[in-house]
Amino acid sequence: AQEAAAHYGCSASASRLLGGEKPIHKKLENAIAAWKHTEDTVVLVGGHSTNVTIVGNFCGKGDLIIYDALAHNSIHEGTRLSDAESRPFPHNDTAALETILRSCRDKYAKVLIVAEGVYSMDGDIAPVPELVRIKKEYGCFLMIDEAHSACVLGRTGGGVDEYFGLAGDDIDMKMGTLSKGLGTCGGYLAG
């Protein structure tokens, strides 16, 4: 931290868009990608805005976003910003999710399933292995919001994939925040 402050100063003074890309940004993204066992990571200004941005822009017209009914407000906001159709499935009910997909998957070019790793209000853990099976069977993308599971679940705090023993690419997108277990600010999307 002292070395970074001496080299870059103690403030970015602005967002990356205004302040410019610095080598330390990519170093952070590479470190998160290695931790989350993904190809790459992008760091954004905050966890809430990361969900809104990704959920709101990953899918478009002719696509479907299907999300857990108890998902965080930022996920709901992202679905409202997207041109894709969206619909919730009952909380942690993978049978209901599969029923929905069976009835309509062929109507959409791309389908994004969104759930949280750990739900902040009640501590429920998502049935991630079953979500992975469903996304593979129906040709969907899977995004897990790890704001409350990264640094908490798993032997070393690696999150849901470590907790459930999943391969690094079983979850297409792992969203997380830097403001909880990592004690700073920002959000990331690893995939």
Predicted ranges, named:
Residues 3-24:
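A glycine-/small-polar-enriched, mobile loop at the entrance of the PLP active site in fold-type I
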Residues 14-21, 29-53:
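Short loop-beta-helix segment that forms the pyridoxal 5′-phosphate
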Residues 37, 61, 81-83, 138, ...:
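Short, structured coil segments at secondary-structure junctions
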Residues 54-73:
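Conserved PLP-anchoring active-site segment centered on the Schiff-base-forming lysine
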Residues 87, 91-144:
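Active-site phosphate-binding strand-loop segment of PLP-dependent enzymes
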Residues 121, 150-151:
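Catalytic P-loop NTPase motifs of RecA-like helicase/translocase cores
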Residues 162-191:
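Active-site PLP attachment segment
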